[in-house]
């Protein structure tokens, strides 16, 4: 059976709605395979919400104008297409906008129902004069990809309802590149860098996670043909392997003082893994193992990125006074009593 080193995925956050994801090391050629699949899935298959149609009070079709409104209906429709919304509803929902002039009409004037959110409230929709008045009824639906206005038009659509091109995808832009990376003596492994920029309706992390779930479901269909078929198995990640190695270390490697070391050995704690499975309360129950010994152990563990059971990470070893040797002699005397 072929075993490949398990790749790692890291995220470099550029801003709230843009991140770079690095996956490495990948077997030669897999960078383009995975990068192209991720890009296409991110751009076309992430579910989202969009306006599918609108109705303007007093307007029968889009090739007209509204009294007191600077923009004609076609311009208003184009502006509405740029709305960024999210919806928790599987069924179509309706939002309303009612504004009396004079002044600008923005997405902040929309009153969305519960479960629907408008993410770009500063979006300009129209401009009203002193006598202007605008009333909109916006239908929001969930979907994927792009759906044209013609496709959103239903056969029994009411007079005055204007279908809108719907861009459901919450992902704005995806680019990727494949670089060479080194694994031991080989330099032909792939390093995949995927740059993802999203609308305000979703974070890049959630978008990539959604794309990964979709691809896993699809590729799972091929595996169902023969679940025992041989492939390339992924070995443990470098992080898991390093952690396992640290946990397997004997406590001698911690270079503890004589008091702390002897107390732990007497209690039957021989490895770092056995040590981190104990809480502070467990260790304090050990004879002659006091708070000073607890602080020493915590200081040693934090240097390895570990901590005792039920203890929060982040212990500051610099706060511990390095005087652990003071009681070693008295402890030795206690041992002989």
Swiss-Prot record:
Listed GO biological process terms: DNA-templated transcription
UniProt keyword annotations, A-Z: DNA-directed RNA polymerase, Nucleotidyltransferase, Transcription, Transferase
- Acidic residues: compositionally biased ranges: 323-337
User: Which reaction does this chain catalyze?
Assistant: RNA(n) + a ribonucleoside 5'-triphosphate = RNA(n+1) + diphosphate
Q: Where is this region: Alpha N-terminal domain (alpha-NTD)?
A: 1-226
- Write out the GO MF terms: DNA binding; DNA-directed RNA polymerase activity; protein dimerization activity
Going by the entry's taxonomy, the superkingdom of the source organism is recorded as Bacteria
Disulfide bridge map: none
One Pfam family from the UniProt entry? RNA_pol_A_CTD
Region span, Disordered: 315-337
| Region spans: Alpha C-terminal domain (alpha-CTD) | 243-337
Q: What class of enzyme is it?
A: transferase
- Gene Ontology terms, cellular component aspect? cytoplasm; DNA-directed RNA polymerase complex
Similarity comment text for this entry: Belongs to the RNA polymerase alpha chain family.
- Chain's role: DNA-dependent RNA polymerase catalyzes the transcription of DNA into RNA using the four ribonucleoside triphosphates as substrates.
- Any domain commentary? The N-terminal domain is essential for RNAP assembly and basal transcription, whereas the C-terminal domain is involved in interaction with transcriptional regulators and with upstream promoter elements.
Name by which UniProt lists this protein: DNA-directed RNA polymerase subunit alpha
Q: Which organism is it from?
A: Kineococcus radiotolerans (strain ATCC BAA-149 / DSM 14245 / SRS30216)
